[in-house]
């Protein structure tokens, strides 16, 4: 099974080797046909401490690194 890859923006980068990434999900409501935007924050492992707040990053599923970190950074733009 392929691993999920999401694109998001770094919202917090204060901890060592850990960042918070906000991912936007856009979908259309089936009943009311309204476009809805939802954001979800993921705790992501940043091995090299290469991210700053506001960076656009791609994250990928990974084995659990800690109790909350199950994602790693693939690419920083």
From Swiss-Prot:
InterPro entries according to UniProt: NA-bd_OB-fold, Ribosomal_uS17, Ribosomal_uS17_bact/chlr, Ribosomal_uS17_CS
HAMAP family in the record: Ribosomal_uS17_B
Pfam family of the protein (one): Ribosomal_S17
Cell membrane among keywords: no
NCBIfam families assigned to the protein according to its UniProt record, in alphabetical order: PRK05610.1, uS17_bact
Function: One of the primary rRNA binding proteins, it binds specifically to the 5'-end of 16S ribosomal RNA.
Quaternary data: Part of the 30S ribosomal subunit.
GO CC aspect terms: cytosolic small ribosomal subunit
Annotated source species: Wolbachia sp. subsp. Brugia malayi (strain TRS)
Gene3D superfamilies assigned to the protein according to its UniProt record, in alphabetical order: Nucleic acid-binding proteins (2.40.50.140)
Name of the protein in its database record: Small ribosomal subunit protein uS17
GO biological process, one term: translation
Protein keywords: Ribonucleoprotein, Ribosomal protein, RNA-binding, rRNA-binding
Stated family: Belongs to the universal ribosomal protein uS17 family.
């Amino acid at each position: 099974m392929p691993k999920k890859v999401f694109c998001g923006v770094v919202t917090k980068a204060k901890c060592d080797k850990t960042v918070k990434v906000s991912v936007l999900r856009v979908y259309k409501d089936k009943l009311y046909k309204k476009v809805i935007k939802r954001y979800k924050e993921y705790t992501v492992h940043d091995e090299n401490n290469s991210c700053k707040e506001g960076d656009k990053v791609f994250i990928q599923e990974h084995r659990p690194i800690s109790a909350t970190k199950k994602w790693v950074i693939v690419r920083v733009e």
